[in-house]
Amino acid sequence: MDGFDVSQAPPEYRSVEPIANLFVLGMGLGWLINYVGMIYQSFKDETYGMAIMPLCCNIAWEIVYSLIYPSKSLTEQGVFIAGLTINIGVMYAAIKFAPKEWSHAPLVMRNLSLIFFLATLGFLTGHLALAAEIGHSLAYSWGAVVCQLLLSVGGLCQLLCRGCTRGASYTLWLSRFLGSSCTVGFASLRWMYWPESFSWLNSPLVLWSLALFLTVDGSYGICYWYVRQYELSLKEAEGRKSK
């Protein structure tokens, strides 16, 4: 049974499919808010909000599973295509403003467009290779796991390396967390009510990935708060000096 084809789902899953679709819509809403917010924040702060490698991996995954191996669920199709369309804007903003973040590394700064292109091409072929190796139904989920872990770890590392909240906000963090948590929600329903195709979601590696996502994304919120407080303390100190 192809776990990607909802029309072949057992009656148990079909009975909870409307709830699963709500989680899919929640996933889409969270990520669309995140993408639009990143475009806004990028132009506001003249930087990029998502680390380069996670961004390239993410847009490559969306290309593969929006255009090459589209879901047979119309809800998922709509969410993925909408996400890909807006993510192109995220990529444009990143390419436009990334040179300002790499003035300390001229070789990188002068070749960022090429780096974005090659990284996206590399991840695109990687997602396709994974689909050819284990089938696109499984590769869809495992590729998404890789994207999520890169996003979580890359986002936290970027925040700590910059030492400031430039290109970030609570809205971006919470919308990303909402979108990913909804993904966990509908995956859980598939595992519980469609075990013939999704029993593997209870595997140690999936559970480890889930624990890592929750730990790192939860840590991001705490670290963001500390960095923001540090920024505010510096601003207050400068204000007192100017008096």
Curated annotation (Swiss-Prot):
Leading EC class: lyase
What EC number(s) does this enzyme carry?
4.2.3.-
Provide the glycosylation site positions. 111
Where are the bilayer-spanning segments?
A: 19-39, 48-68, 78-98, 112-132, 137-157, 172-194, 205-225
- Identify the Pfam families for this entry: Pyr4-TMTC
- Pathway terms, separated by semicolons: Secondary metabolite biosynthesis
Summarize the protein's role: Terpene cyclase; part of the gene cluster that mediates the biosynthesis of the indole diterpenes penitrems. The geranylgeranyl diphosphate (GGPP) synthase ptmG catalyzes the first step in penitrem biosynthesis via conversion of farnesyl pyrophosphate and isopentyl pyrophosphate into geranylgeranyl pyrophosphate (GGPP). Condensation of indole-3-glycerol phosphate with GGPP by the prenyl transferase ptmC then forms 3-geranylgeranylindole (3-GGI).
Q: Which family does it belong to?
A: Belongs to the paxB family.
Protein name listed in UniProt: Terpene cyclase ptmB
Q: Which gene encodes it?
A: ptmB
